[in-house]
C-alpha cells in the first residue's frame, strides 16, 4: 500500500481539529482495506473522542468484518493511558487490527512509546516514521509545548521598504491581502495574542478571527505605565505591566 498517500489523508483529517483540539495535538486516522479507506476520523475538540475511536466507529455496517483485516493509519502514536478518554491502543487491540502505520511518536510523558509497546506486545505490526518531518510541522505547537516546555510563539510584524512599521498618530495598512488571510488563519488556532500599548492606542484593533467557528483568542497588552484607556478600545483585554 502507498503509506505516504494514506498518511497525508490523516494530515488532512487532523487539520479539521485546528483551533478546537488544543491543548491536545491534531490527529487524524484512516482505516484501509485493500487500498480502500473504509473508515476515517479525527480529534474534533478537546475532551472529545480521539481520532482512532472516531475512525473505527465510522466504519459502515457492511464493512465491519473487514476491520480486523485492515491497516490503521494515524499521524500520532495511539495513547496508552486513561485520561479524559480511554486509551486508544486498547481499542485498536480489541478491534482485531493487525497492522498500524504511524507518523510520529507521541512525546507526552504518559505515552512516549507506551502506545507502540502495547500494540506490539499484542501481536500488532507497527511501522513508525512515515512522513515524520511533515508530521512534526503539523503539530509544531504541541511538540514545542511538550518537548521544550514552553508555548509556540508566532512573531508577526509588517514594515515598509524603508523600515517603518507604522504611524505614531494614525492607523495605516502595510500588510497585503494574502498576509491578512494568513493572519486570520493563525488567529483562529491560537489561545492568545500579545501586542503593545501603542498598537492598541493608535490602531485600536479587534484582534479577532473572522472564522465563524473559531474560538477567539485572549487579547494581551503590554502597558507598563498603565496609560491605556480601557474604556476607549474595542477589545476586552488582559493588561501586562
Question: Predicted segments — roles?
Answer:
Residues 131-146:
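Short, structured interface segments
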Residues 111-112, 137-138, 229-232:
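Short, charged, surface-exposed secondary-structure boundary motifs
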Residues 10, 28, 79, 119, ...:
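Residue-level signal for inorganic ion chemistry
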